[in-house]
Amino acid sequence: LAQFPNKARIVIVGVGGIVGASVAHHLLARGWDNVVGIDKSGVPTDVGSTAHASDFCYATSHDFLSCWTTLYSIDFYEKLGHYARIGGIEVARVGDEARMEEIRRKVTSGKAFGTRARLMTPAEIKEKFPLIEEDKVQGGLWDPDAGLVVPRSQAVAGELIDKAEATGKFASFANTPAQSLIVESGRIKGVVTPRGRILCDHVVVCAGLWGRLIAEMAGEDLPVMPIDHPLTFFGPFNEFAGTGKDIGWPLLRDQGNSAYMRDTGDPKTAEGGMIEWGYYEETNPRLCHPRELLEKHQIRLSPSQRDLDMEQILAPLERAIELTPILGELGYDERRSFNGLLQVTSDGGPSMGESQKVRGLWYAVAIWVKDAPGMGKLIADWMTDGRTEIDHAKIDYARFYPHQLEEAFIEGRCREAAQKVYNPAVHPREPYATGRNVRRSPFHQRERELGGYFMELGGWERAHGYAANEHLLAKYGDRIPVRENEWDNRHFWRVSNAEQLAMSEDCGVVNLSHFAIIDVEGPDHLALLEWVCVARIGGDANIGKGIYTHFLDEAGMVRADLTVFRLADRCRIVDGADAGPRDYHYLKRVAANKGFDVTITDVSEKIVTVGVWGPNARSKLQTVVKDADGLSPANFPFAAIKPIEIAGKTVSAFRISYVGEQGWELHMAYEDGLAVWDALRSTGAIAVGIETYANTRRMEKSLRLQNADLLTEYNLLEADLARPKVKDADFCGKASHLRYRERAHQPAILCTLEMTNNVDSHGVPRFPVGSLPVMDPQTGETLVDALGRRSFTTSIAYGPSVGKNIALAYLPWERAQVGRELHVEYFGETFPVVVAAVGYKALYDPENLKPRS
């Protein structure tokens, strides 16, 4: 056994699982050396989820990043000789129309994100999976790339560790738990183990079920929780005796019953001669905190394999027997069956990336077998390059607000996630029921009195529309289609479209309290912002202005989209709620890396913002401000920031518009917000829900949203947001940005599409939500640009002012011409679209005259 080292560049905690082993492999592939892996038990693990995982991979989901990591992982396993690409089936039972629709939606997502899933008939299902009762299913999905990691992901982890050790650049140590972390001045310095201390520059936590306990050593928490996942075995099943196969027939998912099943191949293989049936509890999932996990000497099988009571699964098992009677014919192997612990997360994404509190401490936690090599690659690239080849906003641990890392919040959200692992289908606009009313505007009670239809973002309760405005439907109803399809109409309120139309005729007040607001001050505050921002921030001419700008990553791709208020003594960043935490932590890290003397403070809960917009915004606002003439166009130019007084309160007014109308953003102290809201409402301005601001009018104005339309997979010119000139000062990503500008044209450009016919085959007008593939009308193939990036809608909404379904999508340069006809697919049906605008060009008020009026 190698001597335990006292120094390393990187220590991987939890190296015995498939995630830790994958991280080790990819770090070495990126040129790292002197890497040490430790594990609380065996290497490969005999106690973690990897030790009991079902090890199957389905390629298709509704999330691009998940499809990418799974497809990468499948290829990775296959190149190692450890993947049986046997295919996977998903079925919809007769009578379960919701599941059949979900299967159609999933096939469509596959076309968008690059999987080969297709629909299949009951006869095809029976042919591929003879154990099924054909008359019980109405159809299904065939995923040809689905399959099984063979013989086990546990064995693959062991092989990866052996190969890593053979390089001489890596050493692993079993039965070596991390007892504490050594942290000095906010930076990781090492790990304490029973074998001694090991000093290091970086620690990567891949401890799976125990990940939260390691994070606790750094004074933080991870929003993940282990849940019981019943895994049952029936046998003996000798169909594949003598074949040597680890699996004979395709995988089967019966997600309407929240279950799956598969054979385990030849009885002579390690797990063989059985039928495995697994289930995810929908109504009463059993979660546990990692502190409740037992040690392996305290439990029959292992800490991640808890005893299973047959009563827990009797009802779904009876339904499974109806579909596949063999489960009732074979013997139930109680000794081999168990509750396997796996992890769910508070928002569907794992905890990846650098700690919020400790520099050099990294997490890769809550990752399933199907994604492990892909996530291992992302972490290695992230640590090496500071970026990944696909946008990682959805998995970045920096995305979480402090309240989202509190134990009660984590348990509530994880319980909701556990109830929806397989069923029911999760809507793109699905709200959470727990963790609500955490952050509310100072005029929240007024919004409740108006009958606000609330959703939540970043903890803020946001009304998407107001019941009190439904009288407007009498006036505007003929311009606002009724959404007959329940899925299209779910979590949408028709009144919000009426509010938009009313605002554009008169004036509306919009609650923008969800803004993430960050103050940057100190001697080097301008130096910091000049480095991270594409736009010029310094110079006396910018004082008193709001500067719309972007952060780029090291490769010149779009990392952030925000506004900087240049104040006399500091800068104030106004950001979206979704992107705010990541941008806050990014600023702090850059400042530390560069040695800038700055103070960066999140003041989101101290400042409240209200938008007042419409053709009568100025005249209405003039009735409640102390100095009415101060709002005249001559005295208050576009993009200026000036103090005004409303209801005796000092308000910082920013003349800008995200809704394409004349008006201002009004920023004030939180405690002054109610008085200002009441004063604005006293003018007769209607309350307008956030739907208009965040979706419908934003789309009509061709305005881009970070983490949806703006991603680190595309550059600023492809988003058509590059400034006419590049500033003299250096900034992050500048060299790459200059290279992109030298191209004759970009590989892709963000375009606006209009649906020219939205009526489906049943005669029902559709109003799509989610990501739709953009396809060639002749071939039906999804468009792919010169860099291999696929075209799908990044935002989509019905625009009541233009009277059309409109979407944003990156199109290959050669397809990006106004008037070009293309197709999109929605729930398996094809709809025609036309390119209405190439690049940043609004459909509503294309000359942008209204905001400047």
Predicted regions: what is each one?
Residues 220, 237-360:
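Active-site lid/adjacent beta-loop-alpha segment flanking the redox-cofactor pocket in flavoenzymes
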Residues 28-49:
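Glycine-rich FAD pyrophosphate-binding loop
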Residues 401-853:
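Glycine/proline-enriched, intrinsically flexible loops and inter-domain linkers
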Residues 53-128, 256-261, 267-273, 300-303, ...:
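Dinucleotide-binding Rossmann-like beta1-alpha1 core, especially the glycine-rich loop
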Residues 4-19, 36:
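Beta1/beta-strand and adjacent pyrophosphate-binding region of the FAD-binding site
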Residues 193-250, 687-688:
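Central helical "cap/lid" subdomain
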Residues 303-427, 431-435:
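C-terminal catalytic lobe of FAD-dependent flavoproteins
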Residues 79, 84, 95-174, 180-187, ...:
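Flavin (FAD/FMN) cofactor-binding and adjacent substrate-gating region
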